[in-house]
Design a protein with these regions (language model features):
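Membrane-interface interhelical loops and short interface/amphipathic helices
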Residues: 108-109, 120-171
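Short helix-perturbing small/polar motifs within transmembrane alpha-helices
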Residues: 11, 15, 78-130
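Hydrophobic alpha-helical transmembrane segments
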Residues: 9-17, 56-60, 75-79, 111-112, ...
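Interfacial aromatic-anchored transmembrane helix boundaries in multi-pass membrane proteins
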Residues: 24-33, 63-91
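Small-residue-rich helix-loop
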Residues: 198-242
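Hydrophobic transmembrane alpha-helices
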Residues: 1-61
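Transmembrane alpha-helical segments in integral membrane proteins
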Residues: 173-199
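Alpha-helical transmembrane segments and their membrane-interface exit regions
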Residues: 40-49, 66-67, 82-94, 146-147, ...
Length: 242
């Protein structure tokens, strides 16, 4: 049964509001912070069941709500949560008809590679944005880790701990990126399972065991590793994080 446009966009609005509430749940205390991890689930459900247009509406509403609550979290939500879902939905719903009359959908391996590329692009932009700070991105990351450890321990950290933080700080942005990619995959897969179970899926569920990645992520990884080995400063730190 096809939903009318008004109904579809009403559902999209509800999905956007729910997504914003999940994202803002962290303000309610540490016990609710895990709800933030499924922030993208309502957006994926709307997109995979209703299409790109409703997904855009849901993303815009969710971003607007979070921005009205606090501008900085609103920007973070728009860039880190809503926009990547909209882009993923756009690609996921691409299909073409083969010579035999069968439909071929956008490969899941490319969806995963696109998410990886998006995370890498955000990391590069963050490095450029932090380049004006003392020691660039490295200084910002090291300072943030030190502050967190001081809060957790309730005391100043020693020179040995500071040395270890400085040595391995480049891993931290990459770990955040990996966690973000994992979040995208989990929310997308859960949403596809939900809409498929309800018989509302616009595309068939792909076989995740047959995922084939394109070649370009391997070349990008090799290039960033070389820059990390021979480079230094802000560029070398960002390349190491990649």
């Amino acid at each position: 049964m096809n939903l009318g446009m008004t109904t579809a966009f009403a559902i999209a609005a509800i999905g956007g509001l729910l997504s914003a509430l999940l994202f803002l749940s962290a303000m309610g205390g540490p016990a609710l912070i895990l709800l933030q991890y499924i922030t993208q689930l309502p957006l994926f459900v709307v997109g995979l069941a209703l299409g790109l247009g409703p997904a855009v509406v849901a993303g815009v509403i969710a971003s607007a709500v979070t921005f009205l609550v606090d501008s900085l979290p609103g920007v973070i939500f728009a860039v880190g949560y809503a926009l990547p879902v909209v882009l993923a939905i756009r690609q996921a719903l691409l299909t073409r008809v083969l010579d035999g009359g069968q439909s071929e959908w956008y490969p899941p391996g490319r969806l995963l590679a696109n998410a990886t590329g998006y995370a890498a692009a955000i990391l590069v932009m963050a490095a450029l944005w932090m380049s004006g700070a003392d020691d660039g991105m490295a200084g910002v990351v090291i300072g943030a880790i030190q502050q967190v450890l001081q809060v957790l321990s309730g005391d100043q950290i020693g020179p040995e701990a500071e040395g270890m933080i400085a040595q391995y700080a480049f891993l931290f942005p990459g770990l955040i990126g990996m966690s973000w990619i994992f979040m995208m995959v989990i929310n997308g897969a859960l949403a596809q399972g939900l809409v498929s179970g309800a018989g509302r899926n616009l595309r068939p569920t792909p076989s995740f065991v047959e995922i084939e990645l394109p070649d370009w992520p391997a070349y990008a990884l090799g290039g960033s590793a070389q820059i990390w080995l021979i480079g230094g400063g802000n560029i070398g730190f960002a390349a190491g994080a990649l």
